[in-house]
Amino acid sequence: NEKGKYVKIHCADKNCMFSLKTGRTIPVYLVDEEIYAKCPTVIISTVDKFARLPWSERVGLLFGRTDRYCSRCGHIAIGEKHAGRHNADVAAGLERAETVACKPFYPPELIIQDELHLITGPLGTIYGGYETVVEEMCCIEKNGKKIRPKYIVSTATIRNAGEQIKFLYGRNEFAQFPPSGFDTRDSFFIKEVPLPTENLVDASEEKISRMISDGKKPFRQYAGICASGQSVKTTLIRLYSIILQTALDIAKEPEYEDYIDPYYTLIGYFNSIRELGGAVRLLDDDIASRIRVVKNKYNSLEQRYLSFEGKKEITSRIPSWDIAQVLEKLAISYDKNKEKQGCYDVVIATNMIAVGMDVDRLGLMSVVGQPKQNSEYIQATSRVGRQHPGIFTVYNPYRPRDLSNYENFVGFHSQMYRYVEGTTTTPFAARARDRVLHALVVSLLRLQVETMADNGGASNINDISDEQIKDIL
């Protein structure tokens, strides 16, 4: 409702208490203006929204800075211009609305930041600057003492956490959970499991599940491939063709048809759009031709054909709504009773899948080239193999770094978290201040000084005392 400035969200289930017939709406708000008006208890956002701080006085509503409430428009920010009443609008179905005074409320007391390892480099530098404004707005005074908000940050791949927390949040003390511990073979994030000595081909599902719960079955297995004298494209063609054709051959065998699902969809991981673009052409031509060669070489009963619908990519070139559909379809399993499968054959992607792709059925991935950061390699390969192992890393023999990782393959993969690089964040460096300091000052002026909150409040800059400016700086 454009005039009413709200969006009603109902459940499609007629028996739900939030269905359309009950008149109740799901208390979830998706539009920025509605979030400002409703001031919900929990706010989920991305860090790029920090850029709105100096541009709108309504952002202050997220920190409890309200002094009026309109029955139609919701909370009104301190210093925001707003009419005292609204006349009824019969055409829009809106009743007369009054604006009444209200008290400000407490700002957020708990901030949860996920994927801390991604806040690094230029993003982390700008983020650290804006974080000073967010923390200042979340502080409350009690008995002459300033109480700051509590932060909970999570990540699975981090090094020098104390230094990064100091640069981002200005905190010298922090508690890390879980602690490092006393046994290097079990660090909570990764556990060293000895390979089983018995043959598990004929093991029952109950036995395998029991081994998983007891921590006796490896979840993820890595295989390194480095073909000297061959190009990476040639290696990739042969690897993809043998994996795809072998998956179909095994799926046609009655004794394995119930276990082939994790390996029927191949995830291809690439370090750049350029490398991925070359793989798209290979899938359309060379890999399809090579599959025919593999089929004839091993006398397979049936050839694996890669349809257009069975090949997808997850990159920045694809619209966001298409990516959501691809991720949803990735959960479709192999069905032994269907001749035409609904699951994907191949999905190729860049580091977009390193965060947020959680599909338990996936068990097979090919990583072309060692990523620049080891944390990216760990995050990307953890998207698959959560229940069933299988990751192939194709190294480029003509790149010294790839060759070094291949030669130290076992040592590296047995202690990957040891090789995670430290993050770099410098929010208070000279060049960083040049970029962001003016925005921070404007944000604090608009959010803390009532006469400067409105867009026209800049003309009141002479009314600011020297003490106020010193406090802000």
Where are the language model's segments positioned?
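A short beta-strand element within the Helicase C-terminal
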Residues: 353-369, 391-394
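Conserved helicase ATPase motor motifs in RecA-like P-loop NTPase domains
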Residues: 115-125, 134-164, 179-180
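Conserved helicase ATPase core of P-loop NTP-dependent helicases/translocases
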Residues: 318-349
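Conserved segment of the helicase C-terminal RecA-like domain
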Residues: 343, 379, 383-418
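Conserved two-lobed SF2 helicase motor
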Residues: 41-50, 338-354
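Cys/His-rich short segments
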Residues: 1-31, 64-102
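Conserved interdomain linker/interface between the two RecA-like ATPase lobes of SF2 helicase motors
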Residues: 149, 159-167, 172-286
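SF2 helicase catalytic motif II
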Residues: 40, 48, 62-84, 102-140
